[in-house]
Amino acid sequence: YVTREGGFMDVKGLCKFEKAETQGLAVHPQTGEIFFCNKSGGYIYRFNGPDYEDYEPLFQINRADKIDTRMVFNPEGTALFVVVCNRHCIYKVPYNALTHTFGEPELFAGGWDESGYVNGSGVTARFDNPRQPAFDQDGNMFVPEYGRHTIRKITPTGEVSLYAGLPGQAGFTDGLPEKARFNKPECVTVYLDNSLYVADRDNHLIRRVTVE
């Protein structure tokens, strides 16, 4: 990990995992607990510290291994959202910060192993290789869609819509969200003014989507 005080250059070790393909990382917004996922086994782990190997396995998503994941907590810290990239869906896992325990994972948006592009409510929506999401201050989730070159928006109630880009059209175009073009967006984050920053992977750029 790196720190702001160190100019994001003071790289330090935190956790050493014995298996390859460790993917997906989330920090609880209130407690600071750190969670990560391993692709080969499919388990979500909690890092307890202080030693490198102080971690514990917690649960799998859909009892599956070989899953490529990205994770984020909602702003309240009451749920962990797990994007299963190579299964084209998003799971919601309730979390109790007082007892430090998770509930049962439940499918929140998209369909397991059902790739496509469909807007709509929750499990009726379809994604194509969604990646690292982020929340705004209103509880909306923004999901970069690597396979369709778009940014999707999911409301707190699970309504999925197109936020920016044109489905299936890779490119580089600035402008209004519906006219913008991306090329395999990988990650998003939301700034304090609700501006959305996009890691536009195959354009080798960081893009900014502003709220007018």
Feature annotation, model-predicted:
Residues K184-E212:
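Blade-level signature of beta-propeller repeat domains, shared across WD40, Kelch, NHL, RCC1
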Residues R131-K153:
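Loop/turn-rich, solvent-exposed surfaces of beta-rich toroidal or solenoidal domains
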Residues V27-T31, F73-G77, F135-D138, V190-D193:
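Residue-level detector of Asp-centered blade-edge/turn motifs that repeat once per structural unit
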Residues Y1-G24, D51-T69, L98-N129, E159-E186:
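Gly/Pro-rich loop segments of beta-rich domains
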